[in-house]
């Protein structure tokens, strides 16, 4: 096709002869005419692309040696033409040429490819190790849901990810890293090491890193599993009338951060609502909470979704939330209408009068409870219509009950037969609407009996539903089940909401969209470690979590605590951190443990035999007022028991699952987590043999003496007379000889002088508790 011919055809188009010319001209040449004669936007680009790809040679080759390697044909299949393309000046090739190139084309240097294209190779690994089941044919109910397209290494907001990528690839040009970037320093360090010396262009590296860090979510029709490992293979797993069973291989990459974030937020909300100022406490705790090594606020900003508790904490921290409304398990999104609230006194079925905020106005909502979705239409104190899809009976039942209660229908108020005085987890009385919600979820028959039944619509795609959640030829009034799919509603828009002192979220219109009472009562175990760096939160955790948090706090403030201890400040035992720890000590034993622990620590100080690991171990037990024997001496213990039984105990003289110490490596192991004491132990202590202060009233006088017989128990030691000797095991099980002191509080002059010198040194250092 020459330019002269194009000009001629242009003239022909203005003439009646154009029709004749066009009839004799091939389609691809006509396509070129249109290309040179119009600039209109293609109305159906997808169809145009499909149509173009059906031609013999739809693709253009660039000029050069690489293009010349593709043969004209392979096994009788034409791969390219000899003719020159007018647009690209190169040759045209078929789609088969792409397959030939991928199969038989040259392979360059692939060093470093697995590091760079890690996400692709992991996908291949999951595919290679996957388990494929049978294909089933038949109607597939697919629901549009917002899903993550591929698994991520670590999800973060796009702007944060771009800073992290700059820090990985161009550390010199990136400048001083922001705090939000430096939080990911472990990831940055790991990626720098991996990509070191890679000869791949930075733009490709940046693209692949973005794929690992930035979430790509789409609103896709899905049946079954929605985790990213399944969604990346969605095209192979289901269609409109077929499904393929598939289980991805390898380790699942789906993040545990999201699950741990939900657990943390639920606990923070539950702890905060019992405070005098819930909002203030929630903000304080949230700002001091870390998931793994990342602040909770960063997780909430990076990770999409979560549950009600996550949105409450987001709002408390000033972050935006997705547009939705909650009423317990019921999730709502307004379709149309507006309501106005007025307080009214309502006579309910049990004869009591309740003051309730009644919503006036016609409103329509998209509703969801678990996997059951529907459309609710309501007016003042009346549920007009509820259209739902088929799902699990439990979800259908809960959705219907919650919509009936949410609509504030008069029949619902009349259905109350018993008392409504439910409490939340904090022991507080719930508001009337939440009382009614709890009541009817427990006693659904009271509601359904009062509600009444009617004939279902005659339409073939609709059917009725009875009180047992079965399809029926009669239906609960206003409730209809559709055989068609109701798509999941997408909450893509975010909005800034205000939050009240009592953790209720309010839109600009004044509408309350969710509150602390909507937070799930479910208790879950976090998949990642959650650290609440505030004692106000620790008592909400398990015994092990409280032990871990308390000892972490002691380690963090060790220098200060040691200084206070050596200065003889007795009020040092009264920290909030130890008050929380007291809640896991059996009440009857708290005073005895305190007297024992204080006596041992005092003896260490008096004799200048500080053992840092023993100091850390016993310090939290000193909070309670000490309880001594009638003779003024402390009780003696080998094991300090904590609440919960099992492994919940601390061994005084050796290691235990909760607390153990390795003096060779100077590493403490708290609940399985290792913490180093390097740099926190003075040389004098490190070089000294085991200290004397193990048991109050006893001194270590030498090594194990076989002439003294077997190791004595605590009970046997107590029977010794002053000056008598015995063998015992101390610390991590070291055998030594001890002697019972003649005077419990005796101090020699040189020890007194030593303590004075030590105190002067500490005072000159100065200290402050972090």
From Swiss-Prot:
SUPFAM superfamilies: PB2 C-terminal domain-like. Its main location: virion. GO terms for biological process: 7-methylguanosine mRNA capping; cap snatching; DNA-templated transcription; symbiont-mediated suppression of host gene expression; symbiont-mediated suppression of host mRNA transcription via inhibition of RNA polymerase II activity; viral RNA genome replication. InterPro entries: Flu_PB2_2nd, Flu_PB2_6th, Flu_PB2_C, Flu_PB2_CAP-bd, Flu_PB2_middle, Flu_PB2_N, INV_PB2, PB2_helical. GO terms for cellular component: host cell nucleus; virion component. It is found in: Virion; Host nucleus. A motif (Nuclear localization signal) lies at residues 740-743. The keyword Acetylation does not apply. Keywords: Cap snatching, Eukaryotic host gene expression shutoff by virus, Eukaryotic host transcription shutoff by virus, Host gene expression shutoff by virus, Host nucleus, Host-virus interaction, Inhibition of host RNA polymerase II by virus, mRNA capping, mRNA processing, Viral transcription, Virion. GO terms for molecular function: RNA binding; RNA-directed RNA polymerase activity. HAMAP family: INV_PB2. Belongs to the influenza viruses PB2 family. Influenza RNA polymerase is composed of three subunits: PB1, PB2 and PA. Interacts (via N-terminus) with PB1 (via C-terminus). Interacts with nucleoprotein NP (via N-terminus). Plays an essential role in transcription initiation and cap-stealing mechanism, in which cellular capped pre-mRNAs are used to generate primers for viral transcription. Recognizes and binds a wide range of cap structures of target pre-RNAs which are subsequently cleaved after 10-13 nucleotides by the viral protein PA. Plays a role in the initiation of the viral genome replication and modulates the activity of the ribonucleoprotein (RNP) complex. This is Polymerase basic protein 2.
